[in-house]
UniProtKB/Swiss-Prot annotation:
Membrane topology (Cytoplasmic): 1-13, 65-70, 164-168
Protein name from the UniProt record: Disulfide bond formation protein B
GO cellular component: plasma membrane
Organism placement in taxonomy: Bacteria, Pseudomonadati, Pseudomonadota, Betaproteobacteria, Burkholderiales
Primary localization class, coarse: membrane
Transmembrane segment boundaries: 14-30, 49-64, 71-88, 145-163
Organism of derivation: Polaromonas sp. (strain JS666 / ATCC BAA-500)
Claim: DNA-binding is one of the keywords in the record: no
Cell compartment(s), UniProt: Cell inner membrane
Periplasmic side of membrane: 31-48, 89-144
One Pfam family here: DsbB
Function summary: Required for disulfide bond formation in some periplasmic proteins. Acts by oxidizing the DsbA protein.
């Protein structure tokens, strides 16, 4: 069955999650630099969350102990939950845009002063409108797809935690 893969190879599952996050980030960069879509502040926050999920999944994939696997998977759930929250908020703003389009310039200011912004400016620079839907696939916006991806990652983390805790 599908869930036995989580029991037999949890490190491989985490490595695949990390690779999937890198692929999603690469696609976001493609949309930004090749297609010409400008990311909004909420998109940038989702990128931060995706980078953190990729790093945590990658580090947890090489963990030797079951306790570290469970802890890393828990952190994966928290980070992807945060990313899902931001994506859900952006989706809500896209479905029900306010009369004055704003996605939180104070939030954007926090992002602009974050040290990682200086280290990787090309990835985390953007000024788009959070309520604007620039691109869709199968009727869903980028924020909708981002939400679904974060939820899927959180579910993978929850399954890993459950399966690993039962093995004790």
């Amino acid at each position: 069955m599908f869930l036995t893969y989580f029991d037999a190879m949890p490190r491989r599952v985490l490595a695949l999650v990390s690779l999937a996050c890198v692929a999603l980030l690469a696609f976001g960069l493609y949309l930004q630099h090749v297609v010409g879509l400008e990311p909004c502040p909420m998109c940038i926050v989702q990128r931060y969350a995706l980078v953190l999920v990729a790093v945590v999944a990658g580090i947890t994939a090489v963990a030797k102990s079951r306790g570290l696997l469970i802890t890393g998977s828990g952190l994966l759930v928290l980070l992807s939950g945060f990313g899902a929250f931001v994506a859900a908020r952006q989706s809500f703003l896209q479905w029900y845009p306010p009369e004055v389009a704003s996605c939180g310039r104070d939030f954007y200011g926090m992002i602009e002063t974050f040290p990682l912004k200086r280290a990787i400016p090309m990835i985390f620079k953007g000024s788009g409108d959070c309520t604007k839907i620039d691109w869709t696939f199968l009727g869903l916006s980028i924020a909708n797809w981002s939400f679904l991806c974060f939820v899927a990652i959180a579910l993978v983390g929850l399954v890993l935690i459950t399966r690993l805790a039962r093995q004790r």
